[in-house]
Curated annotation (Swiss-Prot):
PROSITE patterns: BRCT, DNA_LIGASE_N1, DNA_LIGASE_N2. This is DNA ligase. Its EC number is 6.5.1.2. DNA ligase that catalyzes the formation of phosphodiester linkages between 5'-phosphoryl and 3'-hydroxyl groups in double-stranded DNA using NAD as a coenzyme and as the energy source for the reaction. It is essential for DNA replication and repair of damaged DNA. Residues 577-652 form the BRCT domain. One of its GO terms (biological process) is DNA replication. It catalyses: NAD(+) + (deoxyribonucleotide)n-3'-hydroxyl + 5'-phospho-(deoxyribonucleotide)m = (deoxyribonucleotide)n+m + AMP + beta-nicotinamide D-nucleotide.
Length: 652
């Protein structure tokens, strides 16, 4: 039987690839169904012989308990957005400073969910959501039900690939029709439907909803030398790759492609929200590198957002964790980009004044970045009142006087004991990107704060299980889970804690860079601002913000209390070696290396104690050059900085 099962699995997987990937089936649906039924019968009779890549794994019945966290071996960066031709020109100018004659590749930006697929010896072992780029959720069982994702590859490869999982428009219509007939709320748009489907604990539901994918990148180190060749290789492995793409030599060609795609957009069988432009050559990508948040070699052009008219009914003012007071407009409900919008941000008081927004105005609403509803402008021809909006002079939370500093656009409450700021800070501390305390969301934090059980983040680690039972709606099982989640968070690597402290200008990526360099929060506390400012991708603003924060008596007390409660203050990832051959030296890599990949060269320099930066300055000690080094080599020579080549680096 094993031989026949092998034959059937091989045949059915080949036919599935022809149907879903190549769109060129060689057998009829009835023949496929006949072979499929034969395989099901054999697997039922001989369950111990079911193969890992059997197509029957894609259907039916497994109910999951939940989704485990999964650390990405290769981080998933976000992309810098562009909304105009001018911003694309600026991107091109930045690239050409480092790469003399770049070729770009333009691909459609699919409006779906980012996923990462990992194969070991050619077998799918992990399918993961993007999450925060470093940690996602393991949804392997659900992704196995997406019919165009290969369960096995034609080669026994260890490989990680990235792509988008989406719901085709036809599937979306079918799903919503079924939900309407069952009296269930309809999904607002295909992206929400795809997200909701991938979060299903019942894998049979996922199998029925006909999700699809486009893969676009090999995340693990690639042996291809360009993005275009990488896409063709993914196709050879059996992945679905979007065929709508071009190579372009300049922004004129890119802009023409964007206009063409914009005209075709509504006729596509899936949703897109833009075009992604990348430098095609992978060596040039390595040369350009990354900012804290995004690659310097790519940009995502976003199509203009849909706009609708709505009437302003009132304005709410809320206080954030940094004391900024933000106005939010209450509006007559409108349908916008697939969802009902009745509230939209007004940004800040300067924005209200600049746009001259008044009571009862008719305004234009759009979704900034296709996500956040915002008021764009006033329809002055429909103005019914000359009365200006009431701007608060006191904090809506603590009633302290609000300040409007000359160099800021927003009103700010500077009371350090402002309840709203404290509560928002606690919510931020427990959030996924910070300490990631599962279950400790806004609702529980608000109840803990109202019950006077927590006043600062250190209090979170003093909570006992019985404290949660004092809160309305919290039962013993939930209390136990919350307590366990808090205890588990004590072991987080320290960059999570640093970000959780909510220090102004210090985001998650900056926190990671700081801890990679200083090894612990205690070392960072002792560091001077000049050393902080010298770290690649950081700078003076972050350095000054850290200096201001650590200068307060409260910060020293808080760090001591966190340490006393058992919270880890050390970085657990790869750190900079202190007493190595290049310890303390600032090094710049430039040009194309012949034998080492740029990432390998950077890792080697860092392992020898060097700090690798992206630009040459008076602070640079050494420049390692490859072919076509360009302006960085010229600047190093002008400044009299020592220059070394790849052979020298290999000899260390």
């Amino acid at each position: 039987m094993n031989k026949r099962m092998n034959e059937l699995v091989a045949l059915l997987n080949r036919y599935a690839t022809e149907y879903y990937t190549s769109d060129n089936p060689s057998v009829s649906d009835s023949e496929y169904d006949r072979l499929y039924r034969e395989l099901v019968e054999l697997e039922t009779a001989y369950p111990e012989q079911v193969l890992a890549d059997s197509p029957t794994h894609r259907v039916g019945g497994k109910v999951l308990d939940g989704f485990e966290k999964y650390s990405h071996q290769y981080p998933l960066y976000s992309l810098q957005d562009a909304f105009s031709r001018e911003e694309l020109d600026a991107f091109d100018a930045r690239v050409r400073k480092e790469v003399a004659h770049p070729t770009y590749i333009c691909e459609l930006k699919i409006d779906g969910l980012s996923i990462s697929l990992t194969y070991e010896k050619g077998i799918l072992v992990a399918g993961v959501t993007r999450g925060d780029g470093s940690i996602g959720e393991n949804i392997t069982e659900n992704l196995k039900r997406v019919k165009d994702i290969p369960l096995t590859l034609p080669e026994e490869l260890d490989i990680t690939v990235r792509g988008e999982c989406y719901m085709p428009r036809a599937s979306f219509d079918q799903v919503n029709q079924a939900r309407q007939e069952n009296g269930e709320p309809e999904f607002a748009n295909p992206r929400n439907a795809a997200a909701g489907t991938l979060r299903q604990l019942d894998t049979a539901v996922v199998a029925k909803r006909n999700l699809a994918t486009f893969l676009y990148q090999e995340a693990s180190p690639s042996t291809r030398d360009s993005q275009e060749k990488g896409l063709k290789y993914l196709e050879q492995l059996g992945f679905v790759v979007n065929p709508k793409r071009i190579l372009a030599e300049n922004i004129d060609e890119i802009w023409n492609f964007i206009q063409e795609v914009g005209q075709e957009r509504e006729n596509l069988p899936y949703d897109i929200d833009g075009v992604v432009i990348k430098v095609n050559d992978l060596a040039s990508q390595e040369e350009l590198g990354f900012t804290v948040k995004a690659p310097k070699w790519a940009v995502a052009y976003k199509f203009p957002a849909e706009e609708k008219e709505a009437q302003l009914l009132s304005v709410d003012w809320t206080v954030g964790r940094t004391g900024v007071v933000t106005p939010t407009a209450n509006l007559t409900p409108v349908q916008l980009a697939g969802t009902t919008v009745s509230r939209a941000t007004l940004h800040n008081v300067d924005y209200i004044a600049e746009k001259d927004i008044r009571k009862d105005d008719t305004v234009i609403v759009y979704k900034a970045g296709d996500i956040i509803p915002a008021v764009l402008r006033v329809v002055e021809s429909k103005r019914v009142s000359e009365e200006k909006l009431d701007i608060p002079t006191n904090c809506p939370s603590c009633n302290s006087d609000l300040l409007h500093f000359e160099d800021e656009v927003a009103l700010r409450c500077i009371n350090p004991r402002c309840p709203a700021q404290i509560m928002e800070g606690l919510i931020h501390f427990a959030s996924r990107d910070a300490m990631n305390i599962t279950g400790l969301g806004p609702s529980i934090v608000e109840k803990l704060f109202a019950a006077n059980l927590v006043k600062d983040v250190a209090d979170i680690y003093r909570l006992q299980e019985e404290d949660f039972l004092l809160l309305e709606g919290v039962k013993e099982k939930s209390a136990a889970k919350l307590y366990q989640a808090i205890q588990a968070s004590k072991e987080n690597s320290a960059e999570k804690l640093l970000f959780g402290l909510g220090i102004r200008h210090v985001g998650s990526k900056a926190s990671q860079l700081l801890l990679q360099y200083f090894h612990s929060i205690e070392n960072l506390y002792q560091a001077d601002s000049e050393e902080v400012a010298s770290i690649e991708s950081l700078g003076g603003v972050i350095a000054k913000s850290l200096q201001t924060y650590f200068a307060t008596e409260g910060s020293e007390i808080l760090l001591r209390e966190l340490k006393e409660t058992g919270v880890n203050l050390d970085y657990k990832g790869q750190t900079v070696v202190a007493d190595a051959a290049l310890s303390g030296l600032t090094v710049v890599l430039t040009g194309k290396l012949e034998r080492l990949k740029r990432s390998e060269a950077k890792s080697k320099l860092e392992s020898l104690g060097a700090k690798v930066t992206g630009s040459v300055s008076k602070k640079t000690d050494l420049v390692v050059v490859g072919a076509d080094a360009g302006s960085k080599l010229q600047k190093a020579q002008e400044l009299g900085i020592q220059v070394r080549d790849e052979a020298w680096l290999e000899s260390l």
